[in-house]
């Protein structure tokens, strides 16, 4: 639904993905603009759970309009399962409150995750991995269902944990914020670095995401293809992948 990093652009929203198995719908990250896109696929009441990687706005901010839709629009049940890194609820409470009441906690059933935790979310088995990022505690998730695996980095720089996260995944959804080697930091990846991780982890398919709107995705794709010889895509707002097919 959204795949841009840092800010949304005319061609796409910030990070946000709909992961579906059968009739179960998991909203994976909720970056700016993704709630509107989500409603092109499901109603707010059809969202069964939310899974957030970290507390940066381009990955979570649209849980706020989703909250208002549920709280004031009577769109969906109270207590929607909501999984996020430890401390996220405190941030959410700062953004939305009514006379000191943490009304977010009334709409969502928060479950705070730490690295190594494994939770069953509907049909999905979700394992949390600590990523290397800046400013906040950031997790990546390995999501398994019916013998197939989606690995999602959220935001990260190079680290051993991201290789472990991706190991043997059917689909590796990996951030690729940069193209210029001079832009490399310890807190994000380039397309080339994403491809190196994909090759080391022996994933089946690499999907580059979190490109800033200013980048030409064709360049990122070309850079990654020079390193990883498996199938590579760049995430777009309308892209759909059927994992295991």
What name fits each language-model region?
Residues 75-80, 88-110:
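Active-site neighborhood of divalent metal-dependent phosphoester bond hydrolases
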Residues 38, 63-66, 92-95, 162, ...:
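Hydrophobic packing residues within well-ordered alpha-helices of enzyme cores
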Residues 27-31, 48-55, 85, 151-154, ...:
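Active-site neighborhood of phospho(di)ester-bond hydrolases with catalytic His/Asp-centered motifs
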Residues 1-45, 138-154, 171:
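Conserved beta-strand hairpin/beta-sheet module of binuclear metal-dependent hydrolase folds
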Residues 8-12, 103-105, 112-177:
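Active-site-proximal loop/helix segment associated with metal-binding centers of metalloenzymes
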Residues 1-3, 98, 120-126:
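Short Pro/Gly-enriched beta-strand edge/turn motifs at strand-loop
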Residues 33-81:
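Active-site metal-binding motif and surrounding structural segment of the metallo-beta-lactamase
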Residues 157-245:
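Cap/insert and terminal regions of metallo-dependent hydrolase folds
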